[in-house]
Amino acid sequence: MYEYIKGTYMGINKEYIVIENGDIGYKIHSSGYTIANMPNIGEHIMLYLTQIVREDFIGLYGFGSKEELELFNKLLTVNGIGAKASLSLLSITNVENLKRAIVLEDEKLLIKAPGIGKKTAQRIILELKDKLDVNLDEGIQTDSNDIKVSSKILEEAKEALMSLGYSEKECEKALKNVEEKESLEIIIKESLKFLMN
C-alpha cells in the first residue's frame, strides 16, 4: 500500500521511530541498522515502507534502503519468521553481510540475532539461500565504533534496545562501551552500532 515516506525525524520511542509528515506523526517499526543510521532529530528523512495487517495489529515498517526492505519481506516468507524476528536479524549487521551469511550458510552470524536459534537459522538458510543475489567476491563489511555511558538515561536506552530484541546482558555490554552523550537517540544509535559489530 505504501512505497515510502518522506518527513521529519522526530526521535525514537522504545519500539518504533517517529516520522512527522503533514502534521501527523507516524509510528514506524524498524531495524537496529536503520535506527543506528537515523539523522539528528528535526532533520529530513526518507524511509521505504511496508505495512503489516493482522487481526490484532496494523503496523508500518520502514527501512533506509530498498535492499533492506526487500530482505525484510523475503525473511517474512520463511516459515515461522515474523516481523519481530526479521527486524532482529536485520539489526545484527548490514544487508549485504546478512545476505552473504545466508548464502554461505553462516549459522553463527544468524544465531547472534535475539530470538533466532540454530533450527530457525537452518530454516532461513534452506528457504532463502537460492533466492538472494549477493556479491561473494566482496569481504565482510564492518562499521567499527569504540564507544562509555552516562547513567542518567542508561535505563531508557537499555529498555529501547531490549525492545528491539537484544538481551539485557547484550544491552549492558553495549552501553558500557558508549561515550557519554547528551541525548537518548545518540546513545541508542551508538549502542546499536556496537551490537552490530
Curated annotation (Swiss-Prot):
Q: Where in the cell is it found?
A: Cytoplasm
Q: Extract the InterPro entries matched here.
A: DNA_helicase_Holl-junc_RuvA_I, Hlx-hairpin-Hlx_DNA-bd_motif, NA-bd_OB-fold, RuvA, RuvA_2-like, RuvA_C, RuvA_C_sf
Q: Where is the signal peptide?
A: none
The role this protein plays is: The RuvA-RuvB-RuvC complex processes Holliday junction (HJ) DNA during genetic recombination and DNA repair, while the RuvA-RuvB complex plays an important role in the rescue of blocked DNA replication forks via replication fork reversal (RFR). RuvA specifically binds to HJ cruciform DNA, conferring on it an open structure. The RuvB hexamer acts as an ATP-dependent pump, pulling dsDNA into and through the RuvAB complex. HJ branch migration allows RuvC to scan DNA until it finds its consensus sequence, where it cleaves and resolves the cruciform DNA.
Entry's Pfam families?
A: HHH_5, RuvA_C, RuvA_N
Q: Does the keyword Cell membrane apply?
A: no
Q: Which SMART domains match?
A: HhH1
Write out the ranges of the annotated region (Domain III): 149-197
The record's GO CC annotations read: cytoplasm; Holliday junction helicase complex; Holliday junction resolvase complex
What is the protein's name according to its record?
A: Holliday junction branch migration complex subunit RuvA
Family membership, please give it.
Answer: Belongs to the RuvA family.
* Region feature (Domain I): 1-64
Q: Name one GO molecular function term.
A: four-way junction helicase activity
- Region Domain II: which residues? 65-143
Lineage, please?
Bacteria, Bacillati, Bacillota, Clostridia, Eubacteriales
Q: Where is this region: Flexible linker?
A: 144-149
Domain remark from Swiss-Prot or TrEMBL: Has three domains with a flexible linker between the domains II and III and assumes an 'L' shape. Domain III is highly mobile and contacts RuvB.
Q: Which CDD domains match?
A: UBA_RuvA_C
Please describe the quaternary structure of this protein: Homotetramer. Forms an RuvA(8)-RuvB(12)-Holliday junction (HJ) complex. HJ DNA is sandwiched between 2 RuvA tetramers; dsDNA enters through RuvA and exits via RuvB. An RuvB hexamer assembles on each DNA strand where it exits the tetramer. Each RuvB hexamer is contacted by two RuvA subunits (via domain III) on 2 adjacent RuvB subunits; this complex drives branch migration. In the full resolvosome a probable DNA-RuvA(4)-RuvB(12)-RuvC(2) complex forms which resolves the HJ.
Q: Which UniProt keywords apply?
A: Cytoplasm, DNA damage, DNA recombination, DNA repair, DNA-binding
